[in-house]
């Protein structure tokens, strides 16, 4: 019989009068034919789970009332479509002493079956009854003797009273649980198990051929030594685990060796890659069962937990191995025999999903993907190209019109100068080389002015809040800055190249007649030599600019700024943020020299024709004004450090007082300077406090020399942790050592500050990249609490019949403007995905995660933590970690990895499934995807946004943080 997913059907045993009855055998020791003896006999209620694949799982057997199929005699019970419920008087009379199941009324049973049973239940009942009778008959025969002396009810009674045969009762109880576990293992659960306990990940090795090649490299005298086993099978990162695996496989063969032959290696490999779940389970059991007695004690469980924790780089879990070993024993050994067996370990592995129910909202299946992507008909190549073109225009129209306008301006300036110099007499000698050089020079003047505008951060921050943000992509200001820099490099090559290798040689080699006729008014009566042109004001200033810009542009590239290129000392100082920061200040000299260069021109003599200063005047003044504003504002924003903490992963948290005039939005950042480290360097950091907080906070991870020195300075000011407290270095206002002075400047706009525009948020942070979104989560949480308070206020007001009370509450309601209500209700859901490599990283924002879990009763915010140091679910190295995680959360409500109520997932997220889930849950919504982290994931997320935007009406808009 096919049942509805997620529902259960309940059947009870009955007298077996004919094969037409859907019944199970009565409990051992009862007379199935004696209906009048219900008061003295014990019947069971069998709870079955009917799966979609027509398999049946026996969940429990409890005392219950009697139900018959195909027996609708009014004299004996009430029938429902072939199902009758008998309620003997004897059972009714004893209901007061029976369990809650026994006290269920007939009306409750009628309601339950009317809701759960479908028409197909009656049609398939006869067939199912035969299978169930046979299964229960086998169950009764196999445990008849044990059940006569030990019933489920009598076991617990004996346990309380403490009579006699405690060990026998415990063994009988375990035997009963084992029988149930065997019935519970169906085809569906076995199929799920095939995905678990994999010793070799598919992406780690390409099968036996690669292992064979590794053997050839590592073998000595034709044997592979135990110490090289991990590297040979592709488990180099989990050497301890691999060595235990080697020992377990050797023990099964009664071998105690330190080396194996190629043939033995092949046998080992065949076993650990066996597709049979039972085979893999036995190997895992053997790894734990080191004394080979077929039983696992608590100490052995502790050892394998420590081994798994070490393989997954979970140092804290290793420290708490004893506690979690006791937790597993408590769950699997309720009889307290002191050991567990293979079948109990199997039960825990197969039923771990039951304990993970708390995270079902976090682990969405791929069904959503199939629902959204199935049925998409294949389109012709022309149709696909046109769709992509339309989408690209819709997605990038802001960038396109800005770039097109910029390119058209450069083309116009180039052509204007090109034709202007074509009319000059110098063209007759220098030719088109002169025209190209002058056209490029005009674009250089324009771009040298334009490149300053995207880095006028205060101006950009202001413009973000205006209507202009609807037409100009201010989020791409840094990218546009880099694009203009590339155009400047191109212009320099054209301008300087044509002068040095083309028109200068033509000038010095021109015959005297042409020189006197066309160039004497520009270069004087004496024809210059090449060195005269180079050492002149124009030549010297040009060379100086080229050298300084080459240095600044080179050190600003990603390879140098991110220290991707390694140099030996002392040249290592040429890489990193400091090299970028200081080299960029060379451009101040470049602009001064550029004005001089544009004043002393060979072919232009009228001052109003020398336009370089005209291009630069406004941008240079604007940028200089911003730098001046930063200087004075940093002195105006006096802050007092309130709290300092240094977390695992070399993360420094600074909490400081909030200046009264410092107003910011969630997602924005500010610049920080510490004179004790450097009196000149300013570094940007995302603000992690919410706008409503009465303090400012930032989280700084040690990545470069400045952050390293900053951490050292504050570490010296921090106090050592007291005994019994967390091992964090902390300092506050009461610390005896004075804290270093800190200067701030900002706030400055960032893409994440526009999160309120979207119906749904998808926030993705890698490591310290989570910082821009912590402030957003805090702000959302505050809005949630405010919204609930407003709803309660409105509810109290509407339900209050007292006019005086209503009058007193009316002003409070009037304060809630429609505009404010609309802004708080705009974002309906937020999904935060935090991916990190280290377990200690979760301490950074532990308080925020607990606060969200406690206050977000409506489930507006979903938090997803991913720890990439742990092997993915299904890997044998993380199997026990997953079990402990599930058990501990089911019992205590706390995740063992993060220390919060938010479950930690292992390995990396499947981003396609994440997008599919979000698409399914929020059809026709505008979803903002905000990302902060490594560029490689940004490309994947951007690509997925484009892909899913072409599938339906839901729109994903991707934004990446730039500093």
Curated annotation (Swiss-Prot):
Gene3D superfamilies, A to Z: EF-hand, Nucleotide-binding domain of ferredoxin-NADP reductase (FNR) module, Translation factors
Compositional bias of kind Basic and acidic residues: 1-12
Residues binding Ca(2+), per UniProt: 289, 291, 293, 295, 300
Span list, region EF-hand-like 2: 253-264
CDD domains reported for this sequence: EFh, NOX_Duox_like_FAD_NADP
Membrane topology, as annotated: Multi-pass membrane protein
EF-hand domain segment(s): 276-311
Cytoplasmic side: 1-399, 457-482, 557-583, 781-963
Domain Ferric oxidoreductase: 438-595
Stated role: Calcium-dependent NADPH oxidase that generates superoxide. Involved in the rapid and transient phase I oxidative burst induced by pathogen infection.
Family membership: Belongs to the RBOH (TC 5.B.1.3) family.
Protein name, as recorded: Respiratory burst oxidase homolog protein A
Native source organism of the sequence: Solanum tuberosum (Potato)
Lineage, highest ranks first: Eukaryota, Viridiplantae, Streptophyta, Embryophyta, Tracheophyta
